[in-house]
From Swiss-Prot:
Protein's recorded name: Uncharacterized protein C10orf62 homolog
Pfam families tied to this protein: DUF5569 (PF17729)
Polar residues compositional bias, start-end: 92-101, 209-221, 231-244, 294-305
Composition bias, Low complexity: 197-208, 247-293
Comp. bias regions, Basic residues: 1-10
Keywords: Phosphoprotein
Keyword Phosphoprotein included in the entry's annotation: yes
Positions of region (Disordered): 1-30, 92-114, 197-305
Organism the protein comes from: Rattus norvegicus
The keyword Phosphoprotein belongs to this UniProt entry's keyword annotation: yes
Residues the record lists as Phosphoserine modifications: 39, 158
InterPro entries documented for this protein: C10orf62
Length: 305
């Protein structure tokens, strides 16, 4: 009897112990389902946050965009239709929240401007060449040897005709070199003002010289080859009156400029070794030699001779 009660009591205790276990199972499943549902709800949001999390890093990065633009312009002129092409490069850089844009011309000088300059050179060259042909034909027509043999030599041509042909040649070369200097000065963003005065007016007050004209020395030597008396103008490095400024050559030997002018009977400048008209260079240190400043005047002197 006691054994049966003990067995029954043991069975009831086992059932009471099993009930809480069974009651915890639904709770466990409910908790698991709840957190799984929350995890499923938060997972897309987390994915969105994680995907958006790269955007600030992308903002701190850099993005470069280069855009090439070609502009073609049609110009109607006397020679027909001319096409001018301009190339531009537009660069856009994005760094964080700042956006910088840069546009630059791919060519250093505008092709249209360069074409116009060389068109003017070609027109002048054509005109001078026609004049040279006219002078040459007139010389040949006056040569008796040309009528006999159909050939003429320089020794059979009069000095006046040879001088006329030489003037045409010098004018052709001088015009070409002057326009070439203008093109080079424009490409280097420099400015040169030529003083085209004639006899007795050799002032250089308007002659503003800037750097990047060192190649003009060889051009002045070209004209010095025709007149030996101008060779004394070659060996002097500078004509700037900067005696009190270091780094500038002295103008003690400027009297050689009077030798060139004395060849044609012009006013001498020997009494003025340091002219005040060159004081416009005081604010510009380190000016290179610029011997082409008398190129135009010398060409005028050649014509007048």
């Amino acid at each position: 009897m006691l054994w049966a009660q003990r067995k029954k009591r043991k069975a009831t205790t086992e059932t009471t112990e099993d009930k809480p276990a069974e009651s915890h199972r639904p709770n466990d499943s409910w908790i698991k389902s709840h957190f799984s549902r929350l995890s499923e709800e938060k997972l897309p949001a987390y994915r969105r946050v994680s995907s958006c999390g790269y955007s600030p890093e992308g903002k701190h990065g850099e993005a470069n965009t280069t855009l090439h633009v070609d502009t073609v312009t049609t110009k109607h002129g006397e020679g027909g239709v001319a096409l001018h092409r301009d190339s531009f490069a537009s660069k856009q850089k994005i760094s964080g929240t700042s956006v910088s844009k840069e546009m630059q011309r791919e060519s250093g000088k505008s092709p249209s401007m360069e074409n116009d300059t060389w068109a003017a050179v070609a027109a002048c060259t054509k005109e001078i060449d026609a004049k040279g042909h006219h002078v040459a034909n007139s010389v040949l027509q006056r040569s008796p040897e040309y009528h006999r043999t159909g050939h003429a030599e320089s020794r059979n041509i009069s000095p006046e005709d040879l001088k006329a042909l030489e003037e045409v040649e010098l004018k052709l070369k001088g015009n070409f070199l002057t326009h070439r200097e203008t093109v080079v000065a424009g490409a280097n963003q420099a400015h040169t003002v030529y003083n085209q005065s004639h006899h007795g007016n050799q002032s250089h007050q308007n002659h503003n010289t800037y750097p990047c004209h060192q190649n003009n020395q060889s051009r002045s030597v070209h004209y010095q080859g025709h007149h030996p008396s101008h060779l004394s103008h070659q060996g002097y490095p500078s004509y700037s009156s900067h005696q009190n400024h270091p780094g500038h050559p002295s103008q003690q030997g400027h009297s050689s400029h009077s030798n060139q002018q004395g060849h044609l009977g012009l006013s001498s400048q020997q009494g003025h070794p340091s002219q005040s008209s060159h004081q416009s260079h005081q604010g510009q240190p380190g000016h290179p030699n610029h011997q082409s400043h008398s190129l135009v005047n010398r060409r005028n002197q050649i014509y007048d001779s």
